[in-house]
Amino acid sequence: MRLSRYFLPVLKETPSDAEIVSHQLMLRAGMIKQEAAGIYAWLPLGHRVLRKIEQIVREEQDRAGAVELLMPTIQSADLWRESGRYDDYGDEMLRITDRHDRDMLFGPTNEEMITDIFRSYCKSYKDVPKLLYHIQWKFRDERRPRFGVMRGREFLMKDAYSFDVDEAAARRSYNRMFVAYLNTFARLGLKAVPMQADTGPIGGDLSHEFIVLAETGESEVFCHADLVEMGAPGLDVDFDGDLQPLVDQRTALYAATEEMHQPEEFAAVPADRQLSARGIEVGHIFNFGTKYSEPMKATVQHQDGQPRPVHMGSYGVGVSRLLGAIIEAHHDEKGCIWPESVAPFGAGIINMRVGDEACDAACETAYQGLVKAGLDPLYDDTDSRAGAKFATADLIGLPYQLVVGPRGLKEGKIELKVRRTGETHEMSPEDAVSRLAEGAFSDV
């Protein structure tokens, strides 16, 4: 992509109403534009990152054996009355009436609808287990939206739901999502700690939140410090095997959100390993048994011929919130430092003297080489000042920046800057392209 053709409305000043770093940088880098309280338009740069995050979430759901579908955003109130949650959910639910005076709602979550879908088609124990997910925009009318996409009213969510014949099978589905989430967040460059959590209005008796530690986190969390450095299970996990040991390894040490915190248990953690910090919730999983299947009569016939309610679980990831969490974890005073897996562009080319025949030719050659290598470069072919070009490249987080100027080209060299470390290397344009293509400076 050539910057002269791209839509990148960067801001020179930080908006005064942006309280946290991720909100500030997303506005300054031209990633989002606020349209109403807690509601944002996703501009091209932000949309590119969002789609990359979404794709990683999708790939890890697929790897774990989940099957994607898509449910509508507008739901019938009748389903929520059937489960008993229509009157209980509160003012966060946006309730609407259609032209026929039928009560509808903009879905804040999908337990009722997915249960209705399941019960319409699955009648036998042979029809389970099932693990279904979708990625869709949600709306919750937050009383006080703040922190940009971290606590907005409209947000992109991945919701997965499991259906199993009994509690033991439901726990196996829970473990699948537990492990899938660890791998997902690791691929996004995040160290997410699973913590015992309150089930809230979703219900159930087993729940974990996945927390990324950050000073701007919405709540206080408590954990054994070893959990922060514990690596992800890895992409070669056998999801059809016994995952309980992997889950046990990551739940044996103390970790709890503020609501579930037990001070006496935390005191038993060695003093030098006690960690109390602020945290950002990026995922939440629940095992809620027959809370929805029983009132909604989602049953399957067992081998003894008797119908029984299926055991269910719910597994959510805030896809749009993840973008903010990644920035909170990866930034400096100059701007975003994206993990390569979600960087909006694979590299940047900065032409220091547009119109100079040698510079233009070298940039064009490098651009075509990076495109051929699949690195999706952003070529700054504008006539902006050099300082402004460097500032923009750092602000939006171009992971590798090829700086092409007439002085270096006289010696057949350009400068390659690694955004993550600040290191610079001088080499020929051809070497720069080939080394980037082979991942010589990769953070993976």
From Swiss-Prot:
<comment type="subunit">
    <text>Homodimer.</text>
</comment>
<dbReference type="InterPro" id="IPR050062">
    <property type="entry name" value="Pro-tRNA_synthetase"/>
</dbReference>
<comment type="function">
    <text>Catalyzes the attachment of proline to tRNA(Pro) in a two-step reaction: proline is first activated by ATP to form Pro-AMP and then transferred to the acceptor end of tRNA(Pro).</text>
</comment>
<protein>
    <recommendedName>
        <fullName>Proline--tRNA ligase</fullName>
        <ecNumber>6.1.1.15</ecNumber>
    </recommendedName>
</protein>
<dbReference type="GO" id="GO:0005829">
    <property type="term" value="C:cytosol"/>
</dbReference>
<comment type="similarity">
    <text>Belongs to the class-II aminoacyl-tRNA synthetase family. ProS type 2 subfamily.</text>
</comment>
<keyword id="KW-0547">Nucleotide-binding</keyword>
<dbReference type="InterPro" id="IPR004500">
    <property type="entry name" value="Pro-tRNA-synth_IIa_bac-type"/>
</dbReference>
<dbReference type="InterPro" id="IPR004154">
    <property type="entry name" value="Anticodon-bd"/>
</dbReference>
<dbReference type="InterPro" id="IPR036621">
    <property type="entry name" value="Anticodon-bd_dom_sf"/>
</dbReference>
<dbReference type="InterPro" id="IPR044140">
    <property type="entry name" value="ProRS_anticodon_short"/>
</dbReference>
<keyword id="KW-0030">Aminoacyl-tRNA synthetase</keyword>
<dbReference type="InterPro" id="IPR045864">
    <property type="entry name" value="aa-tRNA-synth_II/BPL/LPL"/>
</dbReference>
<dbReference type="GO" id="GO:0004827">
    <property type="term" value="F:proline-tRNA ligase activity"/>
</dbReference>
<keyword id="KW-0963">Cytoplasm</keyword>
<keyword id="KW-0648">Protein biosynthesis</keyword>
<keyword id="KW-0436">Ligase</keyword>
<dbReference type="GO" id="GO:0006433">
    <property type="term" value="P:prolyl-tRNA aminoacylation"/>
</dbReference>
<dbReference type="InterPro" id="IPR002316">
    <property type="entry name" value="Pro-tRNA-ligase_IIa"/>
</dbReference>
<keyword id="KW-0067">ATP-binding</keyword>
<dbReference type="Pfam" id="PF03129">
    <property type="entry name" value="HGTP_anticodon"/>
</dbReference>
<dbReference type="GO" id="GO:0005524">
    <property type="term" value="F:ATP binding"/>
</dbReference>
<dbReference type="InterPro" id="IPR002314">
    <property type="entry name" value="aa-tRNA-synt_IIb"/>
</dbReference>
<dbReference type="InterPro" id="IPR023716">
    <property type="entry name" value="Prolyl-tRNA_ligase_IIa_type2"/>
</dbReference>
<dbReference type="Pfam" id="PF00587">
    <property type="entry name" value="tRNA-synt_2b"/>
</dbReference>
<dbReference type="InterPro" id="IPR006195">
    <property type="entry name" value="aa-tRNA-synth_II"/>
</dbReference>
<dbReference type="InterPro" id="IPR033730">
    <property type="entry name" value="ProRS_core_prok"/>
</dbReference>
